[in-house]
Amino acid sequence: MESGGQYENGRYKPDYYKGTQSVNVMPKKEQHNALVMNKKIISILAERDAAVKERNEAVAATKEALASRDEALEQRDKALSERDNAIMETESALNALRYRENNLNYILSCAKRGGSQRFITEESHLPNPSPISTIPPEAANTRPTKRKKESKQGKKMGEDLNRPVASPGKKSRKDWDSNDVLVTFDEMTMPVPMCTCTGTARQCYKWGNGGWQSSCCTTTLSEYPLPQMPNKRHSRVGGRKMSGSVFSRLLSRLAGEGHELSSPVDLKNYWARHGTNRYITIK
């Protein structure tokens, strides 16, 4: 047996007590480089986390800005709706004032011409309302010839739309023309006629020579207001109409029946029952 090799029975026995050297032992220089790389990796991860945090904060700020924008849009829509409602209320109030002013003017004119103050005290309750603008019997006798000329011209222009149709419960044209005196519409003393086909009183449009057109009533349905034509300016779809001569006969008939002409006439049940012009210019 050798002391250095410790051979015994032909075998080599390592000296365990002396310890063994590791094969993977890293040199000091490489250890230093590894520490530097670890620090760099840690700093890169920290920068990444900071960037992610900033991105999340930016996304949250964007969401908050979008929410504020939606709230502002909602407030704007609410303000627009309130403005539209205020405009509609203003128009309704103006219409009511016009009606009242026309009624007062009619009552005052009647009081001045009659020389009595009973029209002022009784206001709208007139016992026997007499028309302001009347036509004497001599002029009434000459009117049929003029009406024939107007009707011929209306056929050429496509505006003869108010030929009355006899129906049960209504007077025919002969009954309307049987009055000795025809009443003509006077804008200074009589209120504008209206139509209640939608359940609400709506003022009618002027149409033709002294005629009227409904602002809400068409040949098939009722809506307010009549929609405008997209291909023609200041025009609306076809609606119910009444010529000036028919309106004068209607006023004469209502005056003969005792109707108070100081209040607006409802033309809902007196419109022509046949077709209308395709384009109507609102005057």
Curated annotation (Swiss-Prot):
Cellular compartments per GO CC: nucleus
Subcellular localization, as worded in the UniProt entry: Nucleus
Pfam families with a match to the protein in the record: GAGA_bind
Highest rank taxon of the organism: Eukaryota
Impact after mutating residue 114 to D: In strain: cv. Ak-1
Coiled coil: 63-89
Span list, region Disordered: 122-176
Broad class of where this protein is predominantly found: nucleus
Expressing tissues: Expressed in seedlings, leaves and pistils.
Biased composition (Basic and acidic residues): 151-162
The keyword Disulfide bond is annotated on this UniProt entry: no
Keywords, sorted A to Z: Coiled coil, DNA-binding, Nucleus, Transcription, Transcription regulation
Keyword Plastid tagged: no
Positions of the UniProt region annotated as Alanine-zipper: 51-86
MF terms (GO), sorted A to Z: DNA binding
Self-association and partners: Homodimer. Heterodimer.
Family per record: Belongs to the BBR/BPC family.
Stated role: Transcriptional regulator that specifically binds to GA-rich elements (GAGA-repeats) present in regulatory sequences of genes involved in developmental processes.
Notes concerning its domains: Alanine-zipper domain is involved in homo- or hetero-dimerization via electrostatic interaction.
Protein's UniProt name: Protein BASIC PENTACYSTEINE5
Species for this entry: Arabidopsis thaliana (Mouse-ear cress)
